[in-house]
Amino acid sequence: MDRAQARKKAEALVAKMTIEERAGQLKYDAPAIERLGIPTYNWWNEALHGVARAGTATVFPQAIGCAAMFDEEEMQKIADVIAEEGRAKYNAFSKEEDRDIYKGLTFWSPNINIFRDPRWGRGHETYGEDPFLTARLGVSFIKGLQGDGETMKVAACAKHFAVHSGPEAIRHEFDAVVSQKDLYETYLPAFEAAVKEGGVEAVMGGYNRTNGEPCCGSKTLLKKILREDWGFEGHVVSDCWAIQDFHQFHKITNGPKESAQMALEAGCDLNCGCTYAYIMAALQDGLVTEEQITEACIRVFTTRFLLGMFDGSEYDDIPYEVVECKEHRNLAVEAAHKGMVLLKNDGILPLDKRKIRTIGVVGPNANNRIALQGNYHGTSSRYVTVLEGIQKEVEDDCRVYYAEGSHMYKDTMENLAWKDDRISEAVITAKQCDVTIVVLGLDELMEGEEPDQSNRGQAGDKASLEFPGCQQRLLEAVVAVGKPVITVVLSGSAMDLRYADVHTNAILQAWYPGAEGGTAVADVLFGRVSPSGKLPVTFYKDTSDLPEFTDYSMKNRTYRYMEQEALYPFGFGLTYGNVKVSAAEFAEQPEKEKPVKIRCTVTNTGKWDTEEVVQVYIKDWKSKYAVRNHSLCGFRRVRVKAGESIETELTIDPRAFTIVDEEGKRYVDSNKFSLYVATTQPDARSTALTGHEAVELRVVFA
């Protein structure tokens, strides 16, 4: 069913409703209209990295870990599995007449905000700091969720529109002031791609204001940009209780009727919250019109018809057996493999069980199930922590010693105990062992969303990039033993790894790797698979390198604009192979405003088969509006066997050659560019870390 047909059906159904019934359907918990055969429906459903908050489901790596795969095809597979399980659960729930929250088909995912500052607590819900990477992965995820069937498999929702990335503590009152250049160059491209390429069915507005307008009541964002400029035809939903913020915290309206008016006039069709309960009162006061209410109602029912809720769907027979089936769980572990980023390796990895008799596993995240999943997660029927994964891997080959070592953030583990009461046990463990794996980091309670956190007053954000003091002291104590140490970090954002970089033998960034992430960590540590993830964010040296958190200017932010050297750059990640782009050329002569095709040779001179990510960055040499450094404009994941060379081809979109000026206008402003082809960025730090130079291709348009 195409949109025109679905809208026609929606118009016919809405025409049979009273105005009161139409207004009632604009709330997230829409009531039944029994006389028309319309069941109750709850629009609030989550599927960030698996069907969330609805019981059992496959728990994939957190979004930031999926982003580290740099793999559009894998991302679409993951989303298709999520949609499959979402349909299966919806089918089963519907047969039981269970239409509660989190049990529907309208999923408020993906989060395609830009992770501009590593202190933002919700950054791990995103695909990182780069607008191009975020756009490509967002489109893949949306296509995977929505499918290409006669009806929509599930409905995706791109959030949070727009310019939304902390601080969490003041998100209900904050005004994100941003230049037109930064708006159109950094904050909007992923949403534009979601609409124009992904065909996303819904868009969610953010809590904050953007340049003075509340996002859920912004005519600039919702009318001009979203609908008029981009041609969006789906529905817009508010973030939860965001419309209430208009009068309660932003103080820009005098009460709920005016807030409902502002949101509805701007084109916010659906209210997650209770403010649209005042729509009828606003109608009686002449603040809104019947036409506005009717149009919003038609839009939300168009979505329901596209999903086949009234006429049936080819997905109605998806059985419950697909939920967390073996095939889906295997895909989740595969995704964790691909997303893990090896930041340092002095040759200690992969570990050889034949040469090791004792292994120490210490740290607060070594046996922490919570740290596997990140936020917005489902419930797995089985979890494998890092400790459990290592124990299973070595079985009878090695003795595994375990010590928790420290609390996640408290100085003591037991009441009345001395400070650092578990560190001595970790030291004893390290002394017993040939190698010690220290598993540090955070979890969803330490970084995340404002109402859900317990991280000592930061409302989900991080005060700094440092590990909590107890964890840092633990690491230093284990290192002081003088035996080999491997650092494994479970976190959703960049941490301060300067000490680990100098003093430990290897560092593996494992993100929040999913329910069975411990299996994936063990597979990487012991060489069952080669790590091949790439950083979707910059690992800064410390917070002194960062601008103020509330400053939304891109100056000195992210790899495209940063002025100092990174500890670990965006796009960086080692493998067990030794892979480089050994040659690159244009497949055909580049022409202005046409796709540019690059053919390159990728060579693995190492001893291990591995996957690798070929990356292309563009540098504009002439325009004064160009980004300070360079920008990602293409990537492709490839597999290269030891001693092998392969050829691959990447296509660079003409948009890569454009700039955005101070008025927010995008156009080609130069005829001289460089394209850098490598397995990392073309910056000096990446070259030093990998030992490989990027291949430069010059483009000069006539």
Predicted regions mapped to residue ranges:
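Short beta-strand elements
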Residues: 685-702
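Glycoside hydrolase catalytic-domain context in secreted enzymes
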Residues: 1-663, 669-681, 702
